[in-house]
Amino acid sequence: ITPLMWLVFALNLMGFFFLLSWTPTLMTAAKLPPATAALAGAALQVGGTVGSLALCGWLQRNRFLAISIMFALAVPVVGSIGFAGLTAQPALLLTATFFAGFLVLGVQSGINVAGAMIYPTSLRSNGSGWQLGLGRIGSIVGPLAGAQLVGMPVQNLYMWSAVPFALGAVICFIVHRLNTARLDAHPELREAQ
């Protein structure tokens, strides 16, 4: 489960840091007013804060299954940002970026907690540290990948930026199944979670 969790962290941080780093620039390049592009970046952060707070109870109860669902929901939302940016309606763009933040940062909050809970208490801080540390590779790769793809039409670029979330959904569902099987085989571990 541990290497899969490293991958889940890296994929989510890759997608999030791409969105955070490139959204204002790409929206300005798509001929939106700089103020609207900046608001799109802010909506991403505000959505993330709201998502982290609003979803914490659901994430705590359903852990990896909830995270997998949120990853899957993030795919069309993130993919739609490029199309929303090309419309003449800033409200559509701000809504898309708000919900992208809601889901993507909500996922990050969820994997921070659920990822730690797969380890026994004696290993929890070590396991969490490795997950966050190796996940940071994604936070470096995301903006760099954006720099390589920046010549694409903005709608295509956001479709590609949704790929890490699609992969994250599948991998997180696998983690859910593996963790459920592990807990069924060792019921004493369920109490530690």
Label each region the model flagged.
Residues 74-87:
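C-terminal ends and interior cores of transmembrane alpha-helices
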Residues 51-63, 150:
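Helix-to-loop junctions at the C-terminal end of transmembrane segments
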Residues 1-52:
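Extracytoplasmic gate region of multi-pass secondary transporters
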Residues 60-72:
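Cytoplasmic membrane-interface "Motif A"-like loop-to-helix N-cap segments
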Residues 116-151:
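A late C-terminal transmembrane helix in Major Facilitator Superfamily
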Residues 105-119:
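Intracellular juxtamembrane helix-capping segments at the cytosolic ends
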Residues 91-106:
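Hydrophobic core of transmembrane alpha-helices in multi-pass small-molecule transporters
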